[in-house]
Curated annotation (Swiss-Prot):
PANTHER family documented for this protein: 54S RIBOSOMAL PROTEIN L1, MITOCHONDRIAL, LARGE RIBOSOMAL SUBUNIT PROTEIN UL1M
Protein's name according to its UniProt entry: Large ribosomal subunit protein uL1
Function (record text): Binds directly to 23S rRNA. The L1 stalk is quite mobile in the ribosome, and is involved in E site tRNA release. Protein L1 is also a translational repressor protein, it controls the translation of the L11 operon by binding to its mRNA.
GO terms, biological process: regulation of translation; translation
Subunit structure comment from the entry: Part of the 50S ribosomal subunit.
SUPFAM superfamilies found in the cross-reference section: Ribosomal protein L1
Native species: Cupriavidus metallidurans (strain ATCC 43123 / DSM 2839 / NBRC 102507 / CH34)
Protein family membership: Belongs to the universal ribosomal protein uL1 family.
């Protein structure tokens, strides 16, 4: 524990908590603080200019990161007939209907994303108490309830991330791994921010992207100077 505490203290000493760093310097600092033995994820937190308590200002959606997430995901799909075959061809790990629902009810949740064709929601809807708390419930707002299940599978496998604002008005997302080149991380961050701007509620007033910070799994958050993102 002492070693961990010393490492955390050393990392904090590298960063001025109130300073906003150019994106290149911010990523360099984050990577230098990512000293765990595994390939830490690089995460971003975006403070939005919205009132998360208002239902018409809940920001939610998904985006396919151009450089991927660095993580392989298992995808389950509720579909039948031609759509089921298309999902399998696209790379789905598990495809089914009532049989898949029974697996879920039995606690067999060996997947990271659940996709459903609209005509299967009569089955999927009964699984809300199981899938919902785990963040697995399909939703059209993030593209996981769709007639084109094959494309949804491809998106998931290609590095799609889902985002939803929390009660504090902050979006949390992973944009890659420590092993990623900075250009890949910046490309992913840009794609995420573009998606957030597109998802801006019509009732949101004032500055929308208020603060952006990047960090690693075990590291300290580093604030990003937004003007450097367009450089």
């Amino acid at each position: 524990m002492a070693k961990v505490s010393k490492r955390v203290a050393a990392n904090k000493a590298k960063i001025e908590r109130t300073k906003f760093y150019p994106i290149d310097e911010a990523l360099s600092l984050v990577k230098s603080c990512a000293s765990a033995k595994f390939d830490e994820s690089i995460d971003v937190a975006v403070q939005l200019g919205i009132d998360a308590k208002k239902s018409d200002q809940v920001v939610r959606g998904s985006v396919v990161l151009p450089a991927g997430t660095g993580k392989s995901v298992r995808v389950a799909v509720f579909a039948q007939g031609e759509k089921a075959e298309a999902a399998k061809a696209a790379g789905a790990d598990v495809v089914g209907m009532e049989d898949l629902a029974e697996q879920v009810k039995a606690g067999n949740l060996d997947f990271d994303i659940v996709i459903a064709s609209p005509d299967t929601m009569r089955i999927v809807g009964t699984l809300g108490q199981i899938l919902g708390p785990r963040g697995l419930m399909p939703n059209p707002k993030v593209g996981t309830v769709t007639p084109d299940v094959a494309q949804a599978v491809k998106n998931a496998k290609a590095g799609q991330v889902q985002f939803r604002v929390d009660k504090a008005g902050i979006i949390h997302a992973t944009i890659g791994r420590r092993s990623f080149e900075d250009t890949a991380l910046k490309s992913n961050l840009s794609a995420l921010l573009d998606a957030l701007v597109k998802a801006k509620p019509a009732t949101s007033k004032g500055v929308y992207l208020r603060k952006i910070a990047v960090s690693s799994t075990m590291g300290v958050g580093v604030r990003v100077e937004q003007t450097s993102l367009s450089a």
